[in-house]
Amino acid sequence: MPQHDQLHRYLFENFAVRGELVTVSETLQQILDNHTYPQPVKTVLAELLVATSLLTATLKFAGDITVQLQGDGPLSLAVINGNNQQQMRGVARVQGDIPDNADLKTLVGNGYLVITITPEEGERYQGVVGLEGDTLAACLEDYFLRSEQLPTRLFIRTGDVDGKPAAGGMLLQVMPAQNAQAEDFDHLAMLTETIKSEELLTLPANDVLWRLYHEEEVTLYDPQNVEFKCTCSRERCAGALKTLPDEEVDSILAEEGEIDMHCDYCGNHYLFNAMDIAEIRNNASPADPQVH
């Protein structure tokens, strides 16, 4: 059995091509546990999680990456946010009924794939592409073609392992500033395309690579753990409250007695009473956390 929730990087010794392989189970489960989603939405979030992990691993700096789908369909928003430490969180917004067999275009409708890269140092970058492909992987390949101009292929699989949702994926990309032959890259992509969900989700990474590339020389590097981690906090909520007009905050306090701020990603609630608000306005730290 593979060690799920790990990202593996690998290189081909005889080709200027790099690869990544990731499988997720517990991370995906934690994202899904916070909400009740129809199965097609769960599948989209699983694919987005895999894609975000793979894309984050291509970054050469510390920072965040957000991959989101948005459109006018019943799935108005699906987003995964991750960072270079492979810490992930995600959420979806559903409006209207979703058939069990809904595909990506049925779910999102007329929409876009938006990728936002935010380095800890440097300028923020955002790329937007229309949903012209039939799958998320195809849309992401279109993004790379338009923005990175590096030949890139993604292979994403979803399923269940021991009754729990799981997902996996592989990425192939020509090394920057290298002259990989197109036929070599296409050959490796054809091999990778043959990976089955069961193989990717149940076999160790080295076994997967052997099945796909046993005639090639491949170097597999130490894995990086993938985990669910939400960045919400009481302090961030306090900062958000401070940006609201005083009269709006006071009106909520008068009606409700306290302000309940809810994190869509992890489900935490942060409660603020009148004393907390007074301390926020005085630039003091709010009273002891009230989280449930």
From Swiss-Prot:
Signal peptide: none annotated. It is found in: Cytoplasm. Under oxidizing conditions two disulfide bonds are formed involving the reactive cysteines. Under reducing conditions zinc is bound to the reactive cysteines and the protein is inactive. One of its GO terms (biological process) is protein refolding. GO terms for cellular component: cytoplasm. The keyword Disulfide bond applies. Its main location: cytoplasm. Keywords: Chaperone, Cytoplasm, Disulfide bond, Redox-active center, Zinc. InterPro entries: Heat_shock_Hsp33 (IPR000397), Heat_shock_Hsp33_C (IPR016154), Heat_shock_Hsp33_N (IPR016153), Hsp33_helix_hairpin_bin_dom_sf (IPR023212). SUPFAM superfamilies: Hsp33 domain, HSP33 redox switch-like. GO terms for molecular function: protein folding chaperone; unfolded protein binding. Pfam families: HSP33. Disulfide bonds join C230-C232, C263-C266. Redox regulated molecular chaperone. Protects both thermally unfolding and oxidatively damaged proteins from irreversible aggregation. Plays an important role in the bacterial defense system toward oxidative stress. Belongs to the HSP33 family. This is 33 kDa chaperonin. It comes from Salmonella choleraesuis (strain SC-B67).
